[in-house]
């Protein structure tokens, strides 16, 4: 047992003893629930922070505050609530028995304080502790003030402690809530209807990914946590709801990285009588408006860069982007779509770039890998990448002028994908053929290929109007708005391996 653990165990034992000493003197409960707060810290600061000491004395304003003790310096306590911090003073006018009990208070305890509001000589508001009540005794100590909670893994495993002691973490999740609310309000103003579709699917679909598998006991059948809501949302468009959106969780049984968590949040939406160009325009409007609403500017810092959401955003085909970011590669500079269709050419090109290829990869998959390795990470400013091959876009409508590619885009900021959208494939026969090609790919070893969904084909046979749809990764978007570089910093409880 380390010295640090021994010290912590000693503190826990001391705090338990303090709680045990309190219990016999409590007529009802050592964890009372009768205290009522009248003001939060920020409310008092906003309303009375500009008053002079004399004005507050004359006002004689009495208040009740509640929160967690974050510091204890002689007769002064620093109390933190959801809105901020305020001090309490346990000296002037405090009853003798309360002073005695004051000595038993520890940093981390949750208390309620009632008394008159004053201004200290340093200009800080404080509440004189005429009355106080211990509401919850903290049995474990908080991390030391100057060392803090710096271990990243502990921050993720014990997010509750992280939120108590790290203002930056609290503000990141406040911003996350604001981003989601702003997106929801924007979509509702654009006459989209918010819906909820199943989280457990009989057939996983809507994206190329490995699903999580579970078992439905009552039906005695396997089911899958959804990898995307797409096929259900498009069924709703078939049913006549012309504009729908959903903000919810998706689950993909894949690896962990600074950009990936198996459980993540998406906003997915569909609009009838629109195409992928309309989606790009709407995305520009959405992101620029929420940036200005939440940050007061369309520009925001991200690492060493300044990201400009003001628009218009760059629009490049995947082939154009590869050529732009490989200016010294003569083969790439001369490459045409006819060559992209040549499997051997694409394999040789990928290998020459140091890419480890899979034998079942198609021309489109090879093009996407080349893009990902050489161009994607350089897309710092908002950029739409178009021209995705049909063989990696099984749900997207083919381009009218070039049937090898689809009317699809992915949206990149800060060197990572944030959104994916396209004009929807509403040709039931073409969709049937592409599902069958996905089944063949799965049989060849691609475990991320899609399943065949016969009911979705039936839905398309009833008629899906011309439609465009898009998914936006909420977690990655929040990373931008909070200037953080790992997805775990914007997910309250990220996936972690259990501790031994």
Swiss-Prot record:
Compartments reported by the entry: Cytoplasm
Binding-site residues for Mg(2+) 1, renumbered to this chain: 410, 417
Primary location group: cytoplasm
Presence of the UniProt keyword Oxidoreductase in the record: no
EC number: 6.1.1.6
Cross-referenced Pfam families: tRNA-synt_2, tRNA_anti-codon
A GO term for molecular function: magnesium ion binding
Matching Gene3D superfamilies: Bira Bifunctional Protein, Domain 2, Nucleic acid-binding proteins
Enzyme class, first EC level, given as a word: ligase
Top-rank taxon, per record: Bacteria
Residues noted as binding Mg(2+) 2 in the record, renumbered to the chain: 417
Biological processes annotated in GO: lysyl-tRNA aminoacylation
Manner of cofactor binding, per the entry note: Binds 3 Mg(2+) ions per subunit.
Cited CDD domains: LysRS_core, LysRS_N
Required co-factors: Mg(2+)
InterPro entries: Aa-tRNA-synt_II, aa-tRNA-synth_II, aa-tRNA-synth_II/BPL/LPL, Lys-tRNA-ligase_II, Lys-tRNA-ligase_II_N, Lys-tRNA-synth_II_C, NA-bd_OB-fold, NA-bd_OB_tRNA
This protein's UniProt keywords: Aminoacyl-tRNA synthetase, ATP-binding, Cytoplasm, Ligase, Magnesium, Metal-binding, Nucleotide-binding, Protein biosynthesis
GO CC terms in record: cytoplasm; cytosol
Catalytic activity: tRNA(Lys) + L-lysine + ATP = L-lysyl-tRNA(Lys) + AMP + diphosphate
Quaternary organization: Homodimer.
Family statement drawn from the similarity comment of this UniProt entry: Belongs to the class-II aminoacyl-tRNA synthetase family.
NCBIfam families hit by this protein: lysS_bact, PRK00484.1
Name this polypeptide is given: Lysine--tRNA ligase
Gene: lysS
């Amino acid at each position: 047992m380390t010295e640090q653990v021994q010290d912590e165990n000693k503190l826990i034992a001391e705090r338990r003893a303090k709680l045990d000493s309190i219990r016999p003197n409590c007529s009802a409960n050592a964890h009372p629930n009768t205290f009522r707060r009248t003001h939060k810290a920020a409310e008092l600061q906003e309303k009375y922070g500009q008053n002079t000491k004399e004005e507050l004395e004359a006002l004689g304003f009495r208040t009740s505050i509640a929160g967690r003790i974050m510091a204890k310096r002689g007769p002064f306590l620093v109390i933190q609530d959801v809105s901020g911090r305020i001090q309490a003073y346990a000296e002037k006018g405090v009853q003798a028995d309360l002073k005695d009990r004051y000595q038993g208070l520890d940093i981390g305890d949750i208390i309620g304080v009632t008394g008159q509001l004053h201004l200290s000589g340093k200009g800080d508001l404080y509440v004189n502790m005429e009355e106080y009540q211990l509401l919850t005794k903290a049995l474990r100590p908080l991390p030391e003030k100057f060392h803090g909670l710096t271990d990243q893994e502990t921050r993720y495993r014990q997010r509750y402690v992280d939120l108590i002691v790290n203002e930056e973490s609290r503000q990141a999740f406040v911003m996350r809530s604001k981003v989601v609310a702003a997106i929801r309000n924007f979509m509702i103003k654009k006459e989209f209807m918010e819906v909820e579709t199943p989280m457990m699917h009989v057939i996983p679909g809507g994206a190329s990914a490995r699903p999580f598998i579970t078992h439905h006991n009552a039906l005695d059948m396997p089911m899958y946590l959804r990898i995307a809501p797409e096929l259900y949302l498009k069924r709703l468009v078939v049913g006549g709801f012309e504009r729908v959106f959903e903000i919810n969780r998706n689950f993909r049984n894949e690896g962990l990285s600074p950009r990936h968590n198996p459980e993540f949040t998406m906003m997915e939406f569909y609009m009838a009588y629109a195409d992928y160009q309309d989606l790009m325009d709407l995305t520009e409007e959405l992101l620029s408006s929420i940036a200005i609403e939440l940050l007061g500017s369309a520009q925001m810092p991200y690492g060493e860069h300044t990201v400009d959401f003001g628009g218009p955003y760059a629009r490049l085909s995947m082939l154009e982007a590869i050529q732009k970011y490989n200016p010294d590669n003569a083969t790439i500079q001369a490459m045409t779509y006819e060559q992209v269709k040549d499997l051997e050419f694409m394999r040789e090109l990928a290998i020459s770039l140091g890419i480890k290829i899979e034998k079942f990869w198609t021309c489109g998959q090879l093009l996407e890998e080349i893009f990902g390795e050489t161009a994607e990470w350089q897309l710092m400013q908002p950029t739409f990448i178009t021209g995705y091959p049909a063989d990696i876009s099984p749900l997207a409508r083919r381009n009218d002028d070039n049937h090898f590619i689809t009317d699809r885009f992915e949206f990149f900021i800060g060197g990572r994908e944030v959104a994916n959208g396209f004009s929807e494939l509403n040709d039931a026969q073409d969709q049937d053929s592409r599902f069958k090609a996905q089944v063949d790919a799965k049989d060849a070893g691609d475990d991320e290929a899609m399943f065949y969904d016969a009911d979705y084909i039936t839905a398309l046979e009833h008629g899906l109007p011309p439609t465009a749809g898009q998914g936006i990764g909420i977690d990655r978007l929040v990373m931008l708005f909070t200037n953080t570089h790992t997805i775990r910093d914007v997910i309250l409880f990220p996936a972690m391996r259990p501790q031994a």
